Amino acid sequence: MDKHARGDADLPPLTDHVDTDALDTLFGRDTPGAPRVSGASLEFDYADFVVTVESVGRIEVRDAGR
């Protein structure tokens, strides 16, 4: 099976690879005492992919082999 044709059930939970609450804190809305980070990005491995999350709201998912 082509790894890009997998269904959601075939992928491990995202929370096994990254703290989604931390992503929300870093890149979510400004809150009192926790301003949003600007001009930053975070990259992590997920399954056979590399995921890049940018503070401007852009999310890129690419093949880890590239």
From Swiss-Prot:
Q: What InterPro entries would the database entry show?
A: HalOD1
Record key words, sorted: Cell shape
Null mutant: what phenotype?
The deletion mutant is hypermotile and forms only rods regardless of growth phase. The mutant has a slight growth advantage in exponential phase.
The record, for Pfam families, names: HalOD1 (PF18545)
The organism's superkingdom is given as Archaea
What role does it play?
Involved in cell-shape determination. Required for the formation of disks.
Q: What is this protein called?
A: Disk-determining factor A
Please give the organism: Haloferax volcanii (strain ATCC 29605 / DSM 3757 / JCM 8879 / NBRC 14742 / NCIMB 2012 / VKM B-1768 / DS2)
